Amino acid sequence: MRLVDLKIQDVAFGGKGVAREQGKAVFVPYTIEGELVSAEIVREKRQFAEADLVEVKQSSPNRVAPECPYFGRCGGCAYQHIDYEHQLAIKWRQLRDALQRIGKLKDVPMRPIIPSPRQYAYRNRITVHAQDGVIGFFRRESHRLIDIESCPISREEVNRALAELREQKHVRDGHYTLRSASEPRVFSQVNDEVAQALRDLIVGLVPPNQELLIDAYCGAGFFAKALLGKFERVIGIDWDRFAIAAAKENASEKETYIAGDVESELTRSDGFLAVEGETRRLGSRRSMTLIIDPPATGLTEGVRKAITDLAPETLIYVSCNPPTLARDLKELQHKFVINSVTPLDMFPQTAEIEVVAHLEAQK
C-alpha cells in the first residue's frame, strides 16, 4: 500500500472517481471530478488500481455534507457527497459515454434526465440482513454487516418497520424485506414518483390504435395495464409466477399473462407464441409494440434474435444497466432506429441509473 496525490478527472459508472497515476487508471470512491485528493492504493492490477480516499485537499464546489451517518461505510449510497443537480449531470454523462464507448453509438438522441422529486426518503422498501445480533446493510465491497438504526433514503414507514424489527428480542439470522404499507409483495420499483414518471413516459412513446402489445419481463403488469387503451390484445410474460398471478387479478378479456421464460416464449415454434391454446403468428404483425425490461444482465443472444425476428413496429427497452443496454443497442441498431434514450433518476444518492430507449423498426 502506498499514499499518492491524485487529480480526479471523471466519475465512472458505479460511482468511483477516476484519476491517472503512472499511466494507469486509479479508482477512488467518494470523490468528484476536479478534486485534488490524497489516496491510499489498496489494490493494484496491470491496467488499473483501486484506492481508498484519505483526504480531500482541494474540494469541488459540488461537494456537500452527506445526510446519512453511515455514508462511506454502508455499501448502499455512492453520491451523498455530491449536490443533487451534479448527480444528475454525472449520470447523464455516464449513460452517454457508455452508449458511445460500448455501443459504438454516435449522435444518440438523448433526452434530459428525469429527476426524482424526493432526493431522500424515497425508497418504499429495503432489504436488511441480520447476523449475530447485527441488523443492517453490508459494508462497502464487503460481506460484513454494519448495524443500521435508520436509512435516510427510505420512507418513514420503512424506517418504522426497521425500528420494530430491531425492537424484537430474538431476530433470526437471515434477510428481511421491509415495505411501506401499500407496497405490493411482488417486484415493483422502489421510487413511487419516478416509477409513475417512467410509466407516463412509456405511455407517451407508444402510438395509439395498435393491434398487439407484448410486455416481456412484465412483472405484475405495471406497464401493460397502463397501455390497455392503445391495444386490441396484450400479452405479458414473466418468470415470476406470483407476479403473473397478481397481473391476472381483475385482468380484462384482452389481457393474457404467461408465467415462463421470456426467451423460450418469444422463440417458441420458430417465432410463434402460444396464447391460451392458440398459436398466433407474431412475426407478421407490424402493428405491434414490444416492451422489454430485462434484469441488469441485459438481453440474452436468443432474446435479441427473437426481437429482430418479431420486428415489432415499436420497441421500448427499459434498462437499469447502461453498459448492457449499450451492448444490446449495438446489435439492435441493425434492425431498428433509435428514436430517443431517456435516463431517469430512480435511485438518488446511489450510482444506479434507469433508462428508457425508444426504437422503431427500420422501414
Can you say where each PLM-predicted feature lies in the sequence?
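Terminal RNA-binding accessory module
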Residues: 1-70, 142
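Rossmann-like S-adenosyl-L-methionine
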Residues: 2-5, 13, 154, 168-363
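Residue-level signal for inorganic ion chemistry
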Residues: 19, 34, 77, 321, ...
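Short nucleic-acid-contacting surface segments enriched for D/E, G, S/T with interspersed K/R
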Residues: 31-38, 160, 164, 168
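Hydrophobic beta-strand signal
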Residues: 38-40, 127, 214
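Extended interfacial segments that mediate partner engagement and assembly in macromolecular machines
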Residues: 54-66, 72-166
